[in-house]
Swiss-Prot record:
It comes from Caenorhabditis elegans. Residues 116-312 form the Peptidase M12A domain. Residues 342-351 have a biased composition (Basic and acidic residues). Residues 1-25 form the signal peptide. This is Zinc metalloproteinase nas-14. The gene is nas-14. Gene3D superfamilies: 1.10.10.1940, Collagenase (Catalytic Domain). Expressed in pharyngeal muscles and mc cells.
Length: 503
């Protein structure tokens, strides 16, 4: 993909064309193939408009009944892929009755994964970067929901979902299904691993965030070794054959990361999970607890992700820089009365005077440095993991509003470095006053005077260019004439607004 980036600049589209018998320039094979490739990348990765829509679109809160309808009884715990169906009952029986001797028996390579990094040290995504690719044909609403889930992790954790490149062997492939529920592997499974989302059921921020948290390496909260201290499992209400979805894991497989049990986790089963009669299957011991939300990452979810991936407050390197401010303490003392004779010698006469100094306060200022945290967000940086790719695809010019805010560095729209110049010009001192000061300083104790000036700071900011509604490609008129405006072409929507009447 990197080799293709340079081809997407507008200048590339002008290379090689033929003129029709009439007026419109007709693109040659090279120009047509570049348009097709642009559309291909736009299909498989999110665009600025998807994240813009994610900010304004309402976030759906699925009900317990809706969540229950997404469960797939053929999958391990309803949504976990990678566990062979034939061996589930036997494996889980031995999990209850006997310590697990060979962890690969439950998660066969290359699909095994779990939280315990002593057991599974290679199942995290390196540096918290998760390459992804989308199935083509996603609707705008589906892309918006995925963008909302990606933003949820971007806002609360250090994990980033980034466009897959040719160098990425391991990546998640987000695809749609019909009547198969929502599902994912747990952790980095190796190669192309699927996050599958049922159409009309699974495309909401919280549901997708749940499946992505599986992909990051997390099981359901009720599977924790210590879960019996926090919830009761009512077997009488569980559908026949579904008890296997309520098992606990031994510590060899699952690691709680030293975090408390979280009723509010997006990974917790809801009360009616796999219910046979509409009555609760999971009952919190805390009567006020509500479990099973699929709306957002809880505070504890975010901490778990950050701790597992050693970032945020759990980073080995501090994420903030430190500066200092000052604390001032003032103490006032009184000086004794002092009489001083001052002699002035003008050219023609001699004047003798006596100056009486009354009691006056002397101020002593003590300055103590105080550390203050400064956020990294003040730096000029891109706020979306897609910015590099978008810049190469020309979105700095064609998605101006979003890019100017979230991709300032990639689009070279950062503030010019601020330079502050302070010049202090002392006021002229009258000759007589200067002599008086010199004389006084030789006969009395010195006092210190602190003077502070407030410099003027000039900041020059490069503003984002205004977006014009015009065609950005020579061949837009031709493509519009042959009906491309009515297609799903992202290229036409971005580069051919005038010809397509989208101004």
């Amino acid at each position: 993909m990197r080799l293709l980036y340079s081809l997407f600049h507008c200048s590339a589209f002008l290379v090689g064309f033929t003129l029709s018998v009439g007026v419109l320039p007709i693109p040659n094979e090279h120009a047509a193939s570049i348009k097709a490739k642009f559309d291909d990348y736009a299909e498989h990765y999110l665009l600025p408009e998807d994240f813009h829509n994610a900010e304004t679109a309402p976030v759906k809160k699925p009900t317990d009944a809706e969540i229950e309808s997404m469960q797939n009884s053929l999958l391990f715990e309803g949504d976990i892929m990678g566990v062979p169906e034939i061996e589930k009952s036997d494996i889980l029986k031995r999990l209850r009755d006997d310590p697990l001797l060979d962890e690969d028996e439950i998660f066969r390579k290359p699909f095994h994964s779990a939280l315990n990094l002593v057991t599974y040290p290679d199942k995290l995504w390196p540096e918290g970067q998760v390459p992804y690719m989308l199935e083509e044909g996603m609707t705008n609403d589906q892309r918006t929901a995925i963008a909302q889930a990606f933003d949820e992790y971007k806002t609360k954790t250090c994990v980033r979902f980034v466009p897959k490149t040719d160098d990425d062997f391991d990546y998640i492939y987000v695809k749609r299904n019909v009547a198969f529920g929502c599902s994912s592997y747990v952790g980095r499974a190796g190669g192309n691993q699927t996050v599958s989302l049922e159409v009309d059921k699974c495309f909401s921020k919280g549901i997708i965030a749940h499946e992505l948290m599986h992909a990051l390496g997390f099981f359901h909260e009720h599977s924790r070794t210590d879960r019996d201290d926090f919830v009761d499992i009512n077997e009488d209400n569980i559908r026949p054959g579904m008890m296997r979805n309520f098992e606990k894991y031994p510590r060899k497989i699952i690691d709680s990361l030293g975090m408390p049990y979280d009723y509010e986790s997006v990974m917790h089963y809801h009360k009616l999970a796999f219910s046979r009669n509409g009555k609760p299957t999971i009952i919190p011991k805390d009567n006020e607890a509500d479990v099973g939300q699929r709306y957002k990452l809880s505070e504890m979810d975010s901490k778990k992700v950050n701790k597992l991936y050693q970032c945020g407050e759990y980073s080995k390197t501090s994420s903030t820089t430190t500066t200092t401010t000052t604390t001032t303490t003032t103490t006032t003392t009184e000086e004794p009365t002092t009489t001083t004779e001052v002699e002035e010698k003008p050219k023609d006469k001699k004047v003798s005077s006596t100056t009486t100094t009354t009691k006056k306060p002397t101020t002593t200022t003590t300055t103590t440095p105080k550390p203050v945290e400064r956020s990294r967000n003040k730096k000029c940086e891109d706020l979306n993991a897609h910015c590099g790719m978008w810049e190469q695809l020309g979105h700095c010019q064609h998605s101006v509003k979003y890019m100017a805010h979230y991709c300032r560095k990639a689009c070279n729209l950062c503030e010019v470095e601020v330079t502050t110049t302070t010049t202090t010009t002392p006021k002229p001192v009258p000759r007589n006053k200067e002599k008086e000061n010199k004389s006084a300083s030789s006969t009395t104790r010195g006092t210190s005077t602190a003077t502070s000036t407030t410099p003027k700071t000039t900041t020059t900011t490069t503003s984002a260019p205004k977006e014009k509604c015009e065609d950005k490609n020579l061949f837009c008129s031709y493509w519009a004439k042959i009906g491309e405006c009515n297609s799903e072409s992202k290229f036409m929507k971005i580069f051919c607004k005038a010809s397509c009447g989208k101004c």
